[in-house]
Amino acid sequence: MGKEDIRSLIDELSSPLDLSNGSVGIILAAGHGKRIKSEKSKMLHEIWGVPTVVRVRAALDGGLDNSAQIVVVGIKAEEVAKSVGKDENLKFVVQEAQRGTGDAVKIAMEAIEGADFSGDVYIVPGDMGLIDEHTIKSFKESFETSKADMMVLTGEYAGDPENNQYGRIIRVPKNFNDGSPAGSLAGEVAEIREYKDILAMKDEEPYEVKHKGKIFVLNKQDMLNLSEFNTGVYAFKDGSLKEHLESLTTENVQGELYVTDLIKIFNENDKKVHAANANDSRLVEGFNLKSTLREMEAIARERVYEKLKDVITIEDRYDFFLSDEVVDRIFELDEAGKAGDIHVHKGVSLGPGVHLSEGVEICDHCQLTGTVYIGPGTNLGERVLISNFPGQEIKIGANTTILNGNEIKGEVKVGDN
């Protein structure tokens, strides 16, 4: 699509924003992710059957109580916007050139320029496929309680520091380099240093951190060894953000505008900066590599297993897929006392349109997609494939047995046995 076609699509998918509840969420979904080595947009890679950007949108929607949302698209704009889809209180904007996260935020803020809004702005990367509404809600509560002008959500990197490619949180140490105590300044977030900027330093090159009239010095290895990382999730008071966005510069190794530089800028202008640490750092990680994406998928599977392990029988905790919609329906059955005898064997995959009933057993490597209703007491043998197109339904009655290797497709009804 050409630029005009993309803008036309963006306008078509966008809706008017209602800013009355005091907050707006911005999703940064313009990047592509070269290191993922895929023609598909980074934002469209799936975690547990759902594109990451769609998961981020749902987390913001729940965590911010249905606040207005602005999605910044860029590379693969058409595919990303269509994946998110049209919805109330949702607007798309385009970052035509990849000039950094700071530029993306500036473009998003232009969408509410002139609007009667003086609330809070929340920013989340579009590739954070494990983040949930509870994490967003907790972050929002921390920000509102803190009375800060800006807050960053941080995580703790548990692996080898050499593999940590996140920006590092630089806090004021307890004692400065000359041994003098930092006093009340100790622990304050002084700035964020991006990973690529750290790598570009010479090994023993000193880096001076100036914070509220004090100076302390770190070198390259000091910063690489920091385990607290920037998740890319931020909260701002709208007025403070607007006031200082124009202060961002491209004086860094990537020649981009960094949102992270606002930490230092806010501190220099006597704005109150806080950080909140995520309860589970795994949920606030993004991805740049296929291996990381697989690790995130494994975490998503583990979370589903932990939810269901005492509700139904899952034969192999490492090899199954039950879509979020199926999980929700299982909990509905459980509330009615009808989920206990559901048995899911190794390698089973159940798509979002699958409806189970009490006493259903689904054997190894069955795959069910489309709209499918499985009656009570039914047994699906190994490698059964059931699928249909949109608008079609497959209904399998109670106490039915489908033998190994059978395929059922289309509009089908199998009566009770």
Give the location of each predicted region.
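Conserved N-terminal catalytic core of the sugar/cofactor nucleotidyltransferase
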Residues: 1-27, 50-141, 145
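Left-handed beta-helix
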Residues: 1-20, 251-417
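Conserved catalytic-core motifs of eukaryotic protein kinase domains, centered on the activation segment
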Residues: 36-40
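A structural signal for short hydrophobic beta-strand segments in well-ordered beta-sheet cores
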Residues: 44, 168-171, 275
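A residue-level structural signature of the nucleotidyltransferase/glycosyltransferase Rossmann-like core
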Residues: 121, 128, 233-234, 285
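Conserved core of the sugar-phosphate nucleotidyltransferase
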Residues: 131-249, 253
